[in-house]
Structures are given as C-alpha cells and as structure tokens.
Amino acid sequence: DQLKADLLLILDGPMHSSKKPTLVFGNRGIASITLKVYGPKTSQHSGHYGNFIPNPALRLTKVLSSMKSDDGRVIIPGFYDGIRITDQVKSVLKKIPSEDELIKKRTKIKSVDKVAESYQESIQYPSLNIRGLQSGWVGSQVRTIIPSIAQAEIDVRLVLESDPLRLINLIKTHIESLGYKI
C-alpha cells in the first residue's frame, strides 16, 4: 500500500533537439542473452593447428551475422510478428520533428539501419543488439592462437507487444537451425 502510485516519473534519456518538453509514454524493456561458442579445451597455436581446429570466434561471428540483414533488420523468422504500428501512431510520430540527420551527425555515422522509416518509428520495434564480444587476445596482448572460447553479450529491446521468452526462444531455435546445441 505504501508503494501504491498513480504515476511514475522518470527523468532519463536524450532530450529532443528542439529543447521542447517531451512526453514519452513508455520505454523499451530488455531481455539479455550470453552466447558462448566453445573451441579446443585450451587455446592452441594457429601455426600448428590453423586449418584443422575450428576457431570459435569465427563461428560466433557467423552465428551473429546470420541474425540480421545488411540493412539492420532482424531476419530471425517471427521476430517482428505481432508488432503493429497503427496509422494513428504513425501520424503522431510524423508530427515529431525529425532528428534523423542530427543523430547521424552527432554520432558520426553515414547510414542508419532500415528497420523503419525514421528514428521515432524505429524505436517502436524490438531490437537485437550485440553489446559486447570477447575472445582471444588483442592489442599489446595479441597472440597467434585459436581461442578456446568466444562470447557475445546480446540485448533484445522489447516493446509492448513483445514477449521476451518468445523472442529468446526464436533466437535459440535460429541458433539450433545452424547446427549448434544450446
């Protein structure tokens, strides 16, 4: 009873470039996945075992690249099922001054993913993001090895119509369809 409330106000996220007050009626949720691909029991010298022992880092990158198209859409069957942006919502989104070019300039990117027609519309869809990769050694620690493991951290951003367990199961099914065991 003490925590009962009519409203929750969160002051978070980027301000619109117009600097005008903005009401946001929800934020995307999150589901997280740790994906590991295993190779040899211990790292092996690539000069001795390259072309014989499969490299888990290469295999992991192939799994990850199979999840999205070159234009940024998740291509796992069913990922966007049930997501509907009504004409009314699209109309409201189009009234928001576009920040697409400003975001590109500020973040120093040349192109954007083509999940939707605009930034505002794109955040109405669930997303699949690789937030981290780890395998072997790089930089001053570089070694000529086939690593024993490769790991990716993935976040799936959820919208109202998204069922996190359904999306995670779709990802699992996709990975299994590539011949991997989960």
What do these predicted ranges mean?
Residues 1-111, 117-126:
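Fold-level recognition of mixed alpha/beta catalytic cores in primary-metabolism enzymes, strongest
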Residues 39-43, 148-153, 182:
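Short acidic (Asp/Glu) and glycine-rich catalytic loops that position anionic groups and cofactors
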Residues 167-176:
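Short amphipathic alpha-helices in soluble, non-transmembrane regions
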Residues 161-167:
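Short, conserved charged micro-motifs
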Residues 48-55, 142, 146, 159:
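Short alpha-helix boundary/capping segments
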Residues 112, 118-144, 148-150, 155, ...:
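A structural supersecondary motif
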Residues 14-16, 40-42, 135-137, 157-161:
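Short, glycine-/Ser/Thr-/acidic-enriched flexible segments
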Residues 1, 177-182:
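Short, intrinsically disordered, charge-balanced linker/junction segments flanking boundaries
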